[in-house]
Amino acid sequence: MTNYRVFDGHCDTPIELWLQNQPLLENTLAVSLARAQRLGTWAQFFAFCTAWVEAKLPRPEIFARALDYFDAQLRENADKITLCRTASEAEAAMQSGKCAAFLAIEGAEAVREDEGLLERAYEMGVRMISLVWNLPNSLAAPCGS
């Protein structure tokens, strides 16, 4: 049997973990480390999308709290998952049998025009931002707007 590498370009698991106070290792969401073990070598973009979260807090605050929660989950599961910022880091993680994790923001309302939060996101490992989800924000709008 051929063992293929899996690279999933998107999941909303980080925000849901925070909202539901669930662990990354074992949860009822789309991605759990325990279930993903059977994949063998894999990489995952973990996306933070605040657009659809009921806004009891400002979107940047939701993002910051979810990012902190997910960072704690990554540290707690460091034997199974590695935060990657480059292709070479991903290759090293997968060669060691760990998930190569990349962070993404889906919809710029998570950072708005807050350069400080954008810098913090980059420092914490965010390497991809899609400017819009399905709603207009202060930086961009979807084509149907």
Residue ranges and their predicted role:
Residues 1-145:
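N-terminal hydrophobic targeting/anchoring segments and the immediately downstream early-domain regions
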